[in-house]
């Protein structure tokens, strides 16, 4: 699951890096990554600079140049995100040959990247670029690259199928590849397959995966059962959720906060936030301590059902109980409050968020500014624009246009 969280976290990290004065001061690829610079950057500074550039660079040759100059490596989290940004950028513009040049070129020409770890990362990145056939090719050609093939690359290939949402191919890989290459599936392999069945609307098939795991002496963990719970909720099979919870108890698997969070999120996705709130009350009655994730799911759920008062109430309760809202919680609530016309509360939360150096996206901020102006709070709107321009110098012209359109 770690690879998925890395990819999903890239958008949030981009936002924080763009707000950094250090990154804003870096002007171009030639000065950022030049080896002849009088003040050479550290490896970490190069990675941050590369990530900032890769977001917006349009020339495929320049994207490859930036990646090579930064000497990116999968050992570093920010480098993994930079790789993902480069591939995503190239794929969006349909520069698929450039994606191959980047990933295959690194495996073939960088001795430090001739490893199963980078190959596994490349397998997933190809799927991210909608090039699953290349993911399969890399897996098959590992010997050609003089890279050993273990369960790690098998799991990466299954994850690539999940990224591509090619569930039929995932099932084929699971059935054929372990036998073909003499690979013994592990816990992660089985959890990947549970996710495949649950995402493809066949959550009941996950029972057979659990049975196979146990036949081979591998114990399902809370993640295994959590995936099943999420899958059954998505299919509106609450009775099956009860069965899974009973299985957890029978096997001594703790039903902790993470399991409750999965249940709460699943119910909120199905617009059953009141039912999810009842689970929160049950947690508190049982002496369990909900965390930031618990409240964030509920806040998002009630916002999505246009119950903004309950969402605001939960936000206050969350803070009062010592749970610190993260940036996404702020952004979600600000977005929905603007949508619901509560610009005063949205402004207050926006100021809190910006004090923590968390600035919502341009579209959210523009919605808030225009809403304040409609509420005859033009000065507050202009003040907010001024603060945002300090954080995002690259958007100054856009904000000047927004400000010029405000009532005078």
UniProtKB/Swiss-Prot annotation:
GO terms for molecular function: nucleotide binding; RNA binding. The keyword Ribosomal protein applies. One of its GO terms (cellular component) is mitochondrion. The keyword Cell wall biogenesis/degradation does not apply. Keywords: Membrane, Mitochondrion, Mitochondrion inner membrane, Nucleotide-binding, Repeat, Ribonucleoprotein, Ribosomal protein, RNA-binding, Transit peptide. InterPro entries: Pentatricopeptide_rpt, PPR-containing_protein, TPR-like_helical_dom_sf. It comes from the Eukaryota. Residues 1-26 form a transit peptide. PROSITE patterns: PPR (PS51375). Belongs to the PPR family. P subfamily. This is Small ribosomal subunit protein mS86 (rPPR1). The lineage of its organism: Eukaryota, Viridiplantae, Streptophyta, Embryophyta, Tracheophyta.
């Amino acid at each position: 699951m770690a690879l998925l969280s890395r990819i999903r976290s890239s958008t949030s990290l981009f936002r924080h890096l763009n707000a950094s004065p250090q990154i804003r001061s870096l002007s171009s690829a030639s000065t950022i990554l030049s080896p002849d610079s009088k003040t050479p950057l550290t490896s970490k500074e190069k990675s941050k600079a590369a990530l900032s550039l890769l977001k917006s660079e349009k020339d495929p040759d320049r994207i490859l140049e930036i990646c090579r100059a930064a000497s990116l490596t999968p050992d570093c989290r920010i480098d993994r995100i930079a790789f993902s940004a480069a591939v995503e950028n190239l794929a969006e513009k349909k520069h698929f040959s450039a994606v191959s040049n980047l990933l295959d070129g690194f495996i073939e020409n960088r001795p430090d990247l001739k490893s199963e770890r980078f190959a596994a990362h490349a397998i997933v990145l190809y799927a991210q670029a909608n090039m699953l056939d290349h993911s399969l090719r890399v897996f098959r050609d590992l010997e050609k690259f003089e890279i050993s093939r273990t369960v790690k690359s098998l799991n990466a290939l299954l994850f690539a199928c999940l990224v591509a949402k090619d569930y039929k191919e995932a099932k084929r890989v699971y059935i054929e590849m372990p036998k073909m290459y003499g690979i013994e599936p592990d816990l992660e392999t089985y959890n990947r397959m549970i996710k495949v069945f649950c995402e493809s609307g066949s959550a009941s098939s996950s029972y057979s995966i659990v049975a196979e795991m146990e036949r081979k002496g591998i114990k399902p963990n809370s993640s295994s059962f959590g995936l099943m719970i999420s899958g059954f909720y998505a299919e509106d099979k609450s009775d099956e959720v009860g069965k899974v919870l009973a299985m957890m108890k029978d096997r001594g698997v703790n039903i902790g906060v993470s399991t409750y969070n999965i249940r709460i999120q699943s119910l909120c996705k199905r617009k059953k936030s009141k039912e999810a709130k009842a689970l929160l009350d049950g947690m508190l009655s049982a002496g369990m301590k909900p965390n930031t994730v618990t409240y964030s799911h509920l806040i998002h759920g009630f916002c999505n059902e246009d119950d903004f008062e309950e969402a605001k109430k939960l936000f206050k309760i969350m803070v009062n109980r010592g749970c610190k809202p993260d940036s996404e919680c702020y952004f979600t609530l600000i977005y929905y409050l603007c949508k619901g016309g509560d610009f005063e509360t949205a402004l207050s939360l926006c100021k809190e968020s910006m004090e923590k150096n968390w600035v919502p996206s341009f579209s959210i901020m523009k919605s808030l500014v225009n809403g304040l102006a409609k509420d005859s709070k033009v000065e507050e709107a202009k003040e907010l624009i001024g603060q945002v321009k300090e954080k995002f110098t690259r958007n100054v012209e856009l904000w000047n246009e927004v400000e010029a359109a405000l009532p005078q």
